[in-house]
Amino acid sequence: ALHYEKMGSLNAKEKVRVLLAQALFGKPDNLLLDEPTNDLDVNTIMWLENYLSNYENTVLVVSHDRHFLDAISTHIIDIDYSDINLFSGNYSFWYESSQLAARQQANQNKKAEEKKKELMEFIQRFSANVAKSKQTTSRKKMLEKLNVEEIKPSMRKYPGIIFQPERETGTKILAVDGLSKTVNGEKLFDKVSFTIEKGDKVAFLSREPRAITTLFEIIAGHDQPDSGMVEWGVTINSAYLPLNNSDFFNNELSIVDWLAQFSDDTSELYLRGYLGKMLFSGDEIYKKVNVLSGGEKMRCMIARMQLRNANCLILDTPTNHLDMESIQAFNNNLKLFKGNILFSSHDHEFINTVANRIIELTPNGSIDKLMTYEDYIHDDRVKELKEKLYNTAD
């Protein structure tokens, strides 16, 4: 029946799938895809990865999904200001290679600078000494030949996303018992119960994204369940990154004054430290928050979270609006984070490298598995259980 619906009546996810089908139809010689995984569910992304990795013609794709790029790409085109460079290999190979090259150049420059300083000190010290004139002349020639390569400025800047818990968690983190929620007549989840243990980093999944957002709102204390209870441990200090942050920016405060609302220390010097880590430097901190881009707002929200020194993070789709460098920095820190994390994401790599436990919400119950994301999506027993829970009549 969906095949005969008007495009205008379709939701965003359905429209994306129609446009994707239109692009793929006829197997064109050159396929240009701009963020093709946006608004696609996990199963569709996996299908697209498989389809494109076996595609016989040319594919040019822009994406922030690192796993997707690794799965389909044979070459990476790196555009950095006016420089365009072509690399053989997938995204991970390019990332590791570029990081290694940057470190090697920095080390070479450091050694060259040290040698330059040593030669200049010798020349200054013995320039008036006739007995050392030969050695001085020799070192002058060495100094002229010494090449300290100028490191070109890069548009790639990695924010300092560092969450540091003020205190270690106790043994009791979070207990959720019998939570149910129906919105506008649609049951999002029913009698959901789970206990978060010390060290758990839990990725929440659902075919209905509103279910996860609603659950997080309830856990964070911003919404009420139809039934059930949420109980936090006494040692837990949580920080919440909501999916929709628009209400935080409905004002004309400057970035620094906006952040001051959430800080005990409101001095500009202190706040600059946090904003600098989030790549807001100089006079940028006086920019009005109501004109910020989606990525800038997200960096403000992350700075706000860092101020809390929380030992439990609740993150609803945290990579939204972030560039690749910010996603990588976020990902790297969460892997090292010593507290607990409850999060949702559409980023395969992000989930697989952070989560050690998966909880999937369905209208007819939940699935709770202590395993990685890769293991979860390929587990036959999980697939059977998902089919049963999603297809059970209410």
Positions of predicted regions on the chain:
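ABC ATP-binding cassette signature C-motif
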Residues: 1-109, 166-394
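Regular, well-ordered alpha-helical segments
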Residues: 96, 103, 121, 125-128, ...
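Proline-centered turn/helix-capping motifs that create local helix->coil transitions or kinks
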Residues: 131-135, 145-155, 231
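Generic structural signal for well-ordered, non-transmembrane alpha-helical segments
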Residues: 141-144, 174
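ABC-family P-loop ATPase nucleotide-binding domain
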Residues: 151-175
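ABC ATPase nucleotide-binding domains
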Residues: 105-125, 132-141, 157, 379-394
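Short hinge/gating elements
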Residues: 124-126, 159-163, 257-259
